[in-house]
From Swiss-Prot:
Compartment annotation: Cytoplasm
Encoding gene, per UniProt annotation: hslU
Protein name as it appears in the record: ATP-dependent protease ATPase subunit HslU
Positions annotated to bind ATP: 18, 60-65, 255, 320, 392
Function text: ATPase subunit of a proteasome-like degradation complex; this subunit has chaperone activity. The binding of ATP and its subsequent hydrolysis by HslU are essential for unfolding of protein substrates subsequently hydrolyzed by HslV. HslU recognizes the N-terminal part of its protein substrates and unfolds these before they are guided to HslV for hydrolysis.
Organism of this sequence: Shewanella sp. (strain W3-18-1)
Alphabetized NCBIfam families for the sequence: hslU, PRK05201.1
Length: 442
């Protein structure tokens, strides 16, 4: 779990997302509260429930990007799902409990990596011995092993060469475990236990014996380290720790939640809208979900929902779900100045990406201050005249602007291009001013 302070989290988000201070502060505080809660006494800790967040803002202003960056900072089980992918229980499609099952799978992977990291040194020692055994096979008979000191010295010489990398390119024959093939079984709701038993049965039946392969020592060493580390991990402890991690630190990001709002009076069942909201209620409130790794309680999982709410309002969500998303954060629409900052300030910004890409062809590209202002203004104008898709418009505008350079770069190694206001005007003015062209091209 991340121990970063709210200020540090916001600083990290600032490196990738422009503006939206309210949203950044809210998710930073929510993430820090996960850590604060774990510092409390066990009895009191159970009473502290997470304050779920609803982020409201137009498309392309940074809602999903905040989720992506938060996943990297959280150092905890984190899953981002689209609310539109689910249907009500009893109908064809994914049910919402699958969110928790997927989150548990993520936690299992995260915990396995952590445990394998802890025993990596021991795994390296075991892998080293196996490679030395392949290089210096043990004698089959006692009479062949009369000079043990010589054999030991030879082994130490090879060990030293192996550690120094002198044997990396030498090929050896070694037995490597075959990867297990996963089998996905579709089952009706309520029959997950039977599905898990069937999967375990097929898994045990399908265990393939180790296969002898010829490979370079450098590749073999990596494979053997992974294999030996996996042997050292206790699977039961792994599952217990992963489930504990999900229950105490898990974060679910529900994107496009506005798309499951009920719009107007409709007849018939709302399989993908209000029905999904009703199914989400017990998850957000706290319930127990059956997974193939064990029972998972959702009482302390943090839910962050987001939506553009252009065709619907937050009040169109069913009241019970509204009450379970107590923190509301509104994200601001982006201005031309924001676009200008997006082009230059974030780490690996769009302009830096194009400069680096063209640099691989030996072409130098320079964006001037006036050029960046013109690009930002063009993107903002197109958003105002047509559909406002936020910062995503910059990708379309930049791709159109750089189209000729990208096409000719391979033939113009050593050339230099300056993207200034005149260059932008020559390539984009006609498209920006013609609303029909803007609608179909930009």
């Amino acid at each position: 779990m991340s121990e970063m302070t709210p200020r540090e989290i916001v600083h990290e988000l600032d490196a990738h997302i422009i503006g939206q201070k309210k949203a950044k502060r809210s998710v930073a505080v929510a993430l820090r509260n996960r850590w604060r809660r774990m510092q409390l006494d066990a009895d009191f800790r159970q009473e502290v429930t997470p304050k779920n967040i609803l982020m409201i803002g137009p498309t392309g202003v940074g809602k999903t990007e905040i989720a992506r960056r938060l996943a990297k900072l959280a150092n905890a089980p984190f899953i981002k799902v689209e609310a539109t992918k689910f249907t009500e229980v009893g109908y064809v499609g994914k049910e919402v409990e699958q969110i928790i099952r997927d989150l548990t799978d993520i936690a299992i992977k995260l915990t396995r990596e952590q445990q394998m990291g802890k025993c990596r040194q021991l795994a390296e020692e075991h892998a080293e011995e196996r490679i030395l055994d392949a290089l210096l096979p043990k004698p089959k008979n006692d009479w062949e092993s009369t000079d043990t000191d010589t054999g030991s010295n030879t082994r130490q010489i090879f060990r030293k060469k192996l550690r120094e990398g002198q044997l990396d390119d030498k090929e050896i024959d070694i037995d490597v475990a075959q990867p297990q093939i996963g089998i996905e079984i579709m089952s009706p709701p309520g029959m997950e236990e039977m599905t898990n038993q069937l999967q375990s049965l097929f898994k045990n039946m399908g265990q393939a014996p180790a296969k002898r392969r010829k490979m370079k020592i450098k590749e073999a060493f990596k494979l053997l380290i992974e294999e030996e580390a996996a042997k050292l991990v206790n699977q039961e402890d792994l599952k217990e720790q992963a489930i504990e991690m999900v229950e105490q630190h898990g974060i679910v990001f529900l994107d496009e939640i506005d798309k499951i709002c009920k719009r107007g009076e409709t007849s018939g069942p709302d399989v993908s809208r209000e029905g999904v909201q009703r199914d989400l209620l017990p998850l957000v409130e706290g319930c127990t979900v059956t997974t193939k790794h064990g029972m998972v309680k959702t009482d302390h999982i943090l839910f962050i929902a987001s939506g553009a709410f252009q065709m619907a309002k937050p009040s169109d969500l069913i009241p019970e779900l509204q009450g379970r998303l107590p923190i509301r954060v509104e994200l601001d629409a982006l201005s031309a100045d924001d676009f200008k900052r997006i082009l230059t300030e974030p780490h690996a910004s769009l302009t830096e990406q194009y400069v680096a890409l063209m640099g691989t062809e030996g072409v130098k590209v320079e964006f001037t201050e006036s050029g960046i202002e013109s690009i930002a203004k063009a993107a903002w104008q197109v958003n105002e005249r047509t559909e406002n898709i936020g910062a995503r418009r910059l990708h379309t505008v930049m791709e159109k602007l750089m189209e000729d350079i990208s096409y000719e770069a391979s033939d113009k190694s050593g050339s230099a291009f300056v993207i200034d206001a005149d260059y932008v005007s020559a390539h984009l003015d006609n498209l920006v001013q013609d609303e029909d062209l803007s609608r179909f091209i930009l």
